[in-house]
From Swiss-Prot:
PANTHER family reported for this sequence: ABC TRANSPORTER GLUTAMINE-BINDING PROTEIN GLNH (PTHR30085:SF6), AMINO ACID ABC TRANSPORTER PERMEASE (PTHR30085)
Organism: Corynebacterium efficiens (strain DSM 44549 / YS-314 / AJ 12310 / JCM 11189 / NBRC 100395)
Lipid attachment site numbers (N-palmitoyl cysteine): 27
UniProt gene name: gluB
Record family assignment: Belongs to the bacterial solute-binding protein 3 family.
Protein name, UniProt field: Glutamate-binding protein GluB
UniProt entry keywords in alphabetical sequence: Amino-acid transport, Cell membrane, Lipoprotein, Membrane, Palmitate, Signal, Transport
Amino acid sequence: MSHKRMFTRLAAATSAAVLAGITLTACGDSEGGDGLLAAIENGNVTIGTKYDQPGLGLRNPDNSMSGLDVDVAQYVVNSIADDNGWDHPTVEWRETPSAQRETLIQNGEVDMIAATYSINPGRSESVNFGGPYLLTHQALLVREDDDRIQTLEDLDDGLILCSVTGSTPAQKVKDVLPGVQLQEYDTYSSCVEALSQGNVDAMTTDATILFGYAQQREGEFRVVEMEQDGEPFTNEYYGIGITKDDTEATDAINAALERMYADGSFQRFLTENLGEDSQVVQEGTPGDLSFLDE
């Protein structure tokens, strides 16, 4: 694949305390209380994720869950349980459409959310974020046998770009390349089918999501990086959403994520779910939200 990029691991400065396995102590009265730590201690955690995104959050025909977000979330809650000497909790998965994420957290319908949840200033006003646990960029999905599209600029010749109703990625491309034609569909899966049938020439969203589709339908699609002036077209930092101002749980999540990088679990999750060619680049460390001020 063009522009293949070596995966860059986060956690360049993993804390010595985490590597040494120092135990994090939850509040003494967490049992019977509210919030993520209480849910883990009590043995039942409700986690929000996507049900329809291959490689990230997917409900399988046997009702099991799979995907990168699923693996990360399961690792985090089990790691927090281990740190505190608790049994691994039972996880109840809850389908979490993008538009409902903050509401589900605020209403207490989920204890945490890992669902391609990009951290941004507006969302940070409503919920706390653990992470970021990965950085991804906007990219294109095209048919494997269509050699017309090798770069972003190749779209600017009247080609048709799939746009999901209410989403912004395709419009961002249109703003830069006026020659692009947008075709709207309700879901990304509908875009994928339209692309497969030749009704559109490309679709765009986060590279992680596109690699999931490419992995699911190997040989049919390929992912094209999008750059502008030599830089990624956009940056999207994925986080784990929890109740606003739950600092203790946020710190516990970040410690679990640091361990996940240090023991190699994240690299394994990434490759298993999104394939060897997944161009996901990690930068920074969990707990570093300085990008919100950029």
